[in-house]
């Protein structure tokens, strides 16, 4: 565990992300829960703790600073909009990535992790209870049945951009943002989006220890 903590702290430094010791401990406890549950429920194909740290925790931690910047920009652009109590929906959350990581790092954000697989939702709820994360909730539902409103709707390896935005559009708040984590150049998926969805930024990420392309596709509803 000591080696994992050192690797985590090194990754946080590379990401220029400052967290409290308590939050770092929560991230490591969360990683331990993933390891424990995966032995029985196969939450993730990644089994080695060091690989979990890189492929899951650090990969998800890479979105924290971009998310904070976008929310700060939203406050500046729409000062009459309440951004003090942000609700975020993590679609197809699986083992809680990136939703649980966001809940730990951003306690001011209420995070709902939705999945259609009951055992994965049960895991999210167990994480919330064990780590005492009052801002984290697991929802066993289809995303298209949710109405929100959510200021941010995110996904990581859930579906194509077109399907992601179509299925979750009813849950997006006015002036809300879609955050889609992608592992490759999303040009083809962007081209397939309807006119009602506008991509306003493709943000390339560097994940410490991960030699692979990562990016965030930021979208909002278009006036068209």
Swiss-Prot record:
Swiss-Prot/TrEMBL catalytic activity: guanosine(527) in 16S rRNA + S-adenosyl-L-methionine = N(7)-methylguanosine(527) in 16S rRNA + S-adenosyl-L-homocysteine
Protein residues bound to S-adenosyl-L-methionine: 92, 97, 143-144, 156
The keyword rRNA processing is annotated on this UniProt entry: yes
Organism whose genome encodes this protein: Albidiferax ferrireducens (strain ATCC BAA-621 / DSM 15236 / T118) (Rhodoferax ferrireducens)
Source species, domain of life: Bacteria
GO CC terms of this entry: cytosol
Its biological purpose: Specifically methylates the N7 position of guanine in position 527 of 16S rRNA.
Localization of this protein: Cytoplasm
Keywords recorded for this protein, A-Z: Cytoplasm, Methyltransferase, rRNA processing, S-adenosyl-L-methionine, Transferase
One Gene Ontology MF term: rRNA (guanine-N7-)-methyltransferase activity
Protein name according to UniProt: Ribosomal RNA small subunit methyltransferase G
UniProt EC number: 2.1.1.170
Pfam families (UniProt xref): GidB
InterPro entries attached to this UniProt entry: rRNA_ssu_MeTfrase_G, SAM-dependent_MTases_sf
Family classification: Belongs to the methyltransferase superfamily. RNA methyltransferase RsmG family.
């Amino acid at each position: 565990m000591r080696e994992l903590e050192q690797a985590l702290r090194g990754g946080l430094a590379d990401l220029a992300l400052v967290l409290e010791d308590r939050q770092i401990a929560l991230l490591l406890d969360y990683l331990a829960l993933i390891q424990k549950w995966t032995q029985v429920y196969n939450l993730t194909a990644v089994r080695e703790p060091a690989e979990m740290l890189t492929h899951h925790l650090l990969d998800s931690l890479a979105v924290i600073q971009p998310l904070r910047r976008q929310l700060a920009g939203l406050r500046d652009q729409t000062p009459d909009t309440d951004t003090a109590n942000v609700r975020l929906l993590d679609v197809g959350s699986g083992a809680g990535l990136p939703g649980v990581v966001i809940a730990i790092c951003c306690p001011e954000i209420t995070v709902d992790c939705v999945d259609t697989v009951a055992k994965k939702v049960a895991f999210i709820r167990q994480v919330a209870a064990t780590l005492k994360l009052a801002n984290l909730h697991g929802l066993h539902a289809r995303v298209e049945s949710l109405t929100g409103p959510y200021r941010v709707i995110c996904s990581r390896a859930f579906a194509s951009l077109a399907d992601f935005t179509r299925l979750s559009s009813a849950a997006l708040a006015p002036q809300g943002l879609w955050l889609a984590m992608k592992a490759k150049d999303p040009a083809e998926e962007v081209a397939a989006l309807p006119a009602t969805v506008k991509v306003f930024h493709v943000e390339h990420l560097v994940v410490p220890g991960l030699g692979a392309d990562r990016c965030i596709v930021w979208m909002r509803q278009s006036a068209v």
